[in-house]
């Protein structure tokens, strides 16, 4: 009798864990659809973004646009590496990983400064909090406005030191990414009026 009770509990725990796993949303240009596709009791992205926004003072549409640009809402996203002889995986170019594409060192700094030592880059809740934390640091250290998606994204991509040095000024590609992220944030802000 005890073994069957244990098996039932294990089965229930596995079902809850699987139900809580997020799959990549299919309609990533519509933030309301993204929230709708991830709105279970255990995995509620709207709740996660709302909490991170409240904690760090960064608007939710800015955080969602950043995550959209960085990973396309793919929990296991990684930058593409170079290929050796065109087919074999080569050297990794970056340690960026997960929803937020946070680098190893920056993620460790986040864990130390926030006390969230068990935070994972593949957890949407943790990634949303990371993006809010990083943007809030940009607001404090670089004097950026919390709604200035363009410059917040430049600082996110370049790092605080790179942004302060102006490394992005000669990089048209990163400027285009920042413009695209700002446009996405504006679109998300409009969409959120009907689902926030």
Q: For each predicted feature, which ranges?
A:
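Bacterial N-terminal signal peptides that target proteins for export
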Residues: 1-10
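C-terminal motif of bacterial Sec signal peptides marking the signal peptidase cleavage site
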Residues: 17-20
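Catalytic glycan-binding domains that act on GlcNAc-containing polysaccharides
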Residues: 22-196
């Amino acid at each position: 009798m005890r073994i069957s009770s244990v098996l039932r509990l294990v089965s229930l725990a596995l079902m809850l864990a699987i139900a809580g796993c997020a799959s990549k949303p299919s309609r990533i240009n519509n933030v309301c659809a993204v929230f709708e596709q991830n709105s279970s009791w255990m995995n509620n992205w709207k709740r996660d973004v709302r909490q991170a926004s409240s904690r760090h003072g960064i608007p939710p549409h800015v955080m969602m646009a950043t995550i959209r640009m960085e990973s396309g809402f793919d929990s296991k996203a990684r930058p593409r590496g170079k290929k050796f002889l065109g087919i074999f995986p080569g050297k990794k170019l970056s340690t960026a990983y997960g929803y937020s594409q946070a680098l190893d060192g920056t993620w460790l700094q986040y864990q130390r400064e926030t006390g969230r030592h068990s935070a994972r880059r593949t957890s949407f809740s943790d990634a949303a909090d990371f993006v809010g934390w990083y943007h809030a640091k940009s607001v404090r250290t670089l004097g950026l406005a919390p709604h200035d998606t363009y410059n917040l994204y430049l600082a996110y991509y370049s790092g605080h030191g790179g942004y302060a040095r102006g490394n992005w000024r000669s990089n048209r590609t990163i400027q285009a990414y920042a413009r695209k992220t700002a446009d996405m944030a504006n679109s998300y802000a409009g969409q959120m009026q009907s689902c926030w």
